[in-house]
Every structure is written in C-alpha cells, then in structure tokens.
Amino acid sequence: MPKSKTRTPVEIAVVGEVDDWEEDVIKGLLEVPARGECAFYIDSAGGSVYGALAVVTLLRYRRLDAAAVVLGECSSAALMLFAACRRRFVTPYSTLLFHRMKWESEKRIASTEALNWAKHFGDLEKDVDDLQVRLFGGAAEQVREWTLLGRYVTGREIVAAGLAEMFEI
C-alpha cells in the first residue's frame, strides 16, 4: 500500500491594508494546489473591497480549504476573507469592525458619471453585505446588525455567535 503524503497547508500572512497584501496573497494562493489547504494569519484594518473580493473569488474558484487566524484586528474588507474561510479562529483579544461600505474618491468626474457611480455603489454595497452574510454561513441577523451599527466586535462575541473558534493565548 503506498504511503499517503500529508500536505502541510500553505501559510499566508495578511497584514496591513488590503492594497498592501492583495498581490502577495493572490500569488500565495496560486502556489496552493487546486483543492489544497491554506491558512491565513490576519492583522488587517481592511481597505479596498475590490481587492478583498479578488482574493475571495480566487479562493473559491480554486476550491481551497482555508483556515483563518485573527492575530489582532480583522476589520472592514478583511472580514470578507475571514468569512470565506471554512475554519475561523480568534483570541479573546481579537477585534473585528463590521460596517457598511464607504465611498471615497479624489477623482474629477462629470455629474452623470457620479450619478451612475452612486447607483452602482448602492447596488454593490447591498450585494457585498449579502455575500458576507452568506460566506459566514450563520448568525445572519447578528452580522447584518453589526454591519448596520458599524460595530466593533470582540473575539468572544464572534465565538458566541457561532462564527469562529476560540484560540486562547
């Protein structure tokens, strides 16, 4: 009988703003065999929802079995990656900020383009909120309430909601 190889999950640091880690995380995910395992170590205040969506899309497209460990903070757009993982770990000291999307632009644009963007932004915000709830796979009303309130949530609260496991330090 052939010996089975035990695969060690590829470990990926997710530290800083989304724009700081998006490229490295995507490259790291491409190193993981399709249907392989990876572990994310997260300390991120969030950032670009598009960058977070790119990472989550690749994670799901390649059907990776992912775990996430919140080392410190996991907020805003970084929550999308956390929610997309099959196993999630927090400490009692973990902080997670749920909030609605924020629009920020320094571009000079015509009023018609601004109106089109405003409609797109409203649709995207609802779709992203729905996706995040679906990715968490539980406590939908709690996640929606935290998001609406712009709430900082502790590791203990995430565990109590059934969305993660506690890792004591």
For the regions a language model picked out, list residue spans one by one:
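Terminal-region recognition feature
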Residues: M1-I169
